[in-house]
Amino acid sequence: MQPRVLLVAALLVLLASARALEAEDPSLLGLMQGYMQHATKTAQDTLTSVQESQVAQRARDWMTDGFSSLKDYWSTFKGKFSGFWDSASEVQPTPASDAS
């Protein structure tokens, strides 16, 4: 064979294989779109996680403040009436000795 015919045949084989690979490989635009979709989903998931974390933290703070206020209220209530409860327990008559 002549070198020119061999060179043209090799070039045609390379072009045919490149065309076949191009059909199999996604285009650069497709790769970028896939990457951007993945990045967008990751960013949305992260933002949702942070927002849920902030909501949970606010709920915990609200519950802690509520229980703290309730504890303070109970301590104040108990402090005001502890003298009354102490004097009421001292004045209780004994049922057996008073009946005789």
From Swiss-Prot:
Pfam families membership: Apo-CIII
UniProt key word Chloroplast: no
Post-translational modification: The most abundant glycoforms are characterized by an O-linked disaccharide galactose linked to N-acetylgalactosamine (Gal-GalNAc), further modified with up to 3 sialic acid residues. Less abundant glycoforms are characterized by more complex and fucosylated glycan moieties. O-glycosylated on Thr-94 with a core 1 or possibly core 8 glycan.
One of the GO biological process terms: cholesterol homeostasis
Keywords, sorted A to Z: Chylomicron, Glycoprotein, Lipid degradation, Lipid metabolism, Lipid transport, Secreted, Sialic acid, Signal, Transport, VLDL
Site features described as May interact with the LDL receptor, chain residue numbers: 41
Localization per record: Secreted
Location of the region described as Lipid-binding in the Swiss-Prot/TrEMBL record: 68-100
GO annotation, cellular component aspect: chylomicron; intermediate-density lipoprotein particle; spherical high-density lipoprotein particle; very-low-density lipoprotein particle
PANTHER family, per the entry: APOLIPOPROTEIN C-III (PTHR14225:SF0)
Family recorded in the similarity comment: Belongs to the apolipoprotein C3 family.
Task performed by this protein: Component of triglyceride-rich very low density lipoproteins (VLDL) and high density lipoproteins (HDL) in plasma. Plays a multifaceted role in triglyceride homeostasis. Intracellularly, promotes hepatic very low density lipoprotein 1 (VLDL1) assembly and secretion; extracellularly, attenuates hydrolysis and clearance of triglyceride-rich lipoproteins (TRLs). Impairs the lipolysis of TRLs by inhibiting lipoprotein lipase and the hepatic uptake of TRLs by remnant receptors.
Full protein name: Apolipoprotein C-III
Taxonomic path: Eukaryota, Metazoa, Chordata, Craniata, Vertebrata
